[in-house]
């Protein structure tokens, strides 16, 4: 997380360059049988880097996307992981509707 003291806000930065190939963002929600990622985040903003763009949103907007579009989690062992994780796969185009506007 990045803390911005001037405005008392925090930013969690995620990198998902593989999304350029898959068309999906991976939003982790559980690892080692415990809540992680989105379910543990206390950040005010999330910035997802897809290898080209920095996409700004909020945890609330991501939850809204997941719930309103009835997206279920998937379970898999990621590269470099030793155990299964649970994550939400969100189509990049779909998450685009939940990005903050006016931030470059």
Regions found by a protein language model. Name each.
Residues 1-3, 37, 46:
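Short secondary-structure boundary/capping segments within folded domains
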Residues 16-41:
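Mg2+/Mn2+-dependent nuclease catalytic core
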Residues 5, 23, 33, 51-104:
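Non-catalytic C-terminal interaction segments of nucleic acid-processing enzymes
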Residues 2-21:
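Conserved catalytic cores of phosphodiester-cleaving nucleases, focusing on short active-site segments
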Residues 39-45, 76-80:
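Short C-terminal domain-edge/linker segments immediately following a structured domain
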Residues 7-8, 35, 42-45, 52-53:
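Short, surface-exposed beta-edge/turn micro-motifs
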Residues 10-12, 48, 56-57:
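A structural signal for short, well-ordered beta-strand segments and their strand-loop junctions
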